């Protein structure tokens, strides 16, 4: 007997069973999934970084 893992939808907070019966997991629906994607695309959400933008100077494709 296996226990079902239950998570909350990150968008609306509804409970979602983490399993094949929930194709949009961790979201409860396609709508909540698209709302989250839109927030990332609009840069309302971001992964915090301690890096300085000057660190990317070494990544330049231009040759000195």
UniProtKB/Swiss-Prot annotation:
InterPro entries: DNA_gyrase_inhibitor_YacG (IPR005584), Znf_NHR/GATA (IPR013088). Zn(2+) binds at residues 9, 12, 28, 32. Signal peptide: none annotated. Residues 54-64 have a biased composition (Acidic residues). One of its GO terms (molecular function) is DNA topoisomerase type II (double strand cut, ATP-hydrolyzing) inhibitor activity. Residues 45-64 are annotated as: Disordered. Pfam families: YacG (PF03884). Binds 1 zinc ion. Keywords: Metal-binding, Zinc. Its cofactor is Zn(2+). One of its GO terms (biological process) is regulation of DNA-templated transcription. The keyword Metal-binding applies. The keyword Cell inner membrane does not apply. Belongs to the DNA gyrase inhibitor YacG family. Interacts with GyrB. Inhibits all the catalytic activities of DNA gyrase by preventing its interaction with DNA. Acts by binding directly to the C-terminal domain of GyrB, which probably disrupts DNA binding by the gyrase. This is DNA gyrase inhibitor YacG. The lineage of its organism: Bacteria, Pseudomonadati, Pseudomonadota, Gammaproteobacteria, Enterobacterales.
């Amino acid at each position: 007997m296996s226990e079902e893992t239950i998570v909350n939808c990150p968008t609306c907070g509804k409970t979602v069973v983490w399993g094949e019966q929930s194709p949009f997991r961790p979201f409860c629906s396609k709508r909540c999934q698209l709302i989250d994607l839109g927030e990332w695309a609009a840069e309302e959400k971001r992964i915090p970084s301690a890096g300085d933008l000057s660190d990317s100077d070494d990544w330049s494709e231009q040759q000195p």
